[in-house]
Amino acid sequence: MLEGGFILLHRSILRWEWYGDLNTARLFIHLLLTVNYEPQRWQGIAVERGQRVASLAKLADETGLTVKQVRTALEHLKRTGEVTHTATSKYG
């Protein structure tokens, strides 16, 4: 887990449409804190700045949410354009 560095979080997040949805807000902030800050490789896959490799189960474990809660929160974030999902031939 990353322990160094910081992110800037603007107060306007208080007006963000998902701010009142605790699971979605928690997952979003967790993703902001855990994405790559520089390009890296993971098992032969290029993982760029702002990206990360994770399963639903891994995100659930890291956030304390259930897999179903993570899935729902990710759907919210994908639907409104905050996150995208890229599948590879090896990983869905």
Language model: regions and residue ranges:
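Winged helix-turn-helix DNA-binding recognition segment
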Residues: 18, 35-92
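Long, low-complexity, charged/polar intrinsically disordered regions in eukaryotic proteins
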Residues: 1-20
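Short helix-coil-helix linker/hinge
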Residues: 21-25
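Basic side chains
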Residues: 11, 26, 68-71
